[in-house]
Amino acid sequence: IRLSLVGSEMCIRDRSVQTAEGALTEVHSMLQRMNELAVQAANGTNSKDTDRKAIQDEIDQLNTEIDRVAETTKFNEIYLLKGDDGTKQINLNAHDAGLKGSLTDKGDGTATFVMDELKAGDAVSIGGKNYTIAATTTDTDDLITKASAKNTDIVINGKTYKYQAAKGAGDDSSAAAAKAGYYEEGVAWAAGAGKTADGLKTLAAAGSTVEAAGKKLTSLSTAEATAGVSASNQSVITDKMAYVKAQTELLSANQIGDTVGNAAVYKAGTTAAATLADATNKFDIKVGKAEVANTLSFSLHVGADADMTNKISVDIDTMNSTFLGIKGLNVTDKNGTAATYAIDAISDAISKVSSQRSALGAVQNRLEHTIDNLDNVSENTSSAESRIRDTDMAKE
C-alpha cells in the first residue's frame, strides 16, 4: 500500500508539459509582436534608414530571445524546447509572394504556382510595384476594329478621332454628310479629311497608345519589345517580363528562413529559370529547408506499477528561430516588400507554435484527468493505510 501511495504521489508532481507549454506561450507572444512590427515595416511611409532600422533592431532582439527560450527551458535538467540529439532537415512552407494565381504545396519539398495569365492592358502588382502589360500592334488593331464596329470614338497617341454618324434628314449636301461613317481628328469635318478604321490602324504603329471603349493599350517598338519594357515608361512591360519579375519575387519569398540554401524557382517542367525568351505563367518551386535538431520524445509514467500502459508519450519539436523559419528575418528593404514576405513567414511560425501548444494542451488535458484519478487513488489508499496502521491488534 505504501509503495502504491508514494508512486501515485510522485506521478502527480510532474509538471514538464506545463513548463513547456508555458514557455511556448511567451514564444507565441513574441511572434505576435514580430507580426505587428512586420506589418508596420511594410507600410510605405517608413524610412529605410530610420524607421525600418528601429523595427529591425526589435525583431532581431525578439529572434534572439526566442532562441534563448528554446535553448534554456528545462524541467528536471531535461531541455524541453531544444530538441534531441542529431539533426534533420525540414521543408518550409511555399509562398506565392502576394501574386494572383494558384499555389499548390505538394508537401514533398516542391510546389507549383500558376500565375493568372496576363493580357494586354492588364494592371498587375509585382514586388510592391504596379505595372501595365504592353500590347502588340495586333492588340491595338483589334481594339480599333471592335471600337469602330460600335461607332465609338478612338484616341491614338493623345489625339481623339470622333466618329461621324450618318447624315440627318434634309442634310444632303453638307460636308458632314459626305463623311458619314468615317473618323476625323477633332470635331471639324473638312472635305477629304475622313479616315476609315483601317486608316486609323496605320496611325497606331508600334509604340503607340490607343484608347477606346474604356480600354487603354500601349504597344512597344521592336527594340522595346525585345527588352520587355517601354523606354519612356518603365511601368509598361511585356507579359514575359512580368513573369520573369514574378519569378524573382517568388524566389525572394521562398528564401526566408532557408538555412540550407535549397529554395529555387524554375520555369514549369524544367530545372532552369525562365527568361524573356521563354517565360510563361507557370512555375515549379523548390521550397526552402532548415536543418534542425531531432524531435524530443519522452514518456510520462502515470501509474504506481510497472505496467507499460501507464505511459503518456510526449513529442516536442525544437522551437528555435531556425525551426520556425524566421532566422535572419529582414524588413529593411526600401519599398517594404521584404517586410510583406516576412509577414507570411511569421504566420507560418505562429502556426507551428500553435500546433505544438495544441499537442501539449491535449496531453495536459489528459494528464488533468489522470491526476484527478491519481488523487482519488492516493486519497483512498492513504485512508486505508492509516486505518491499517491504527488497528488495535490486541482488540482484534
Where are these predicted regions, by residue range?
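Primary detection of the long, small/polar-rich alpha-helical "axial" segments characteristic
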Residues: 2, 7-396
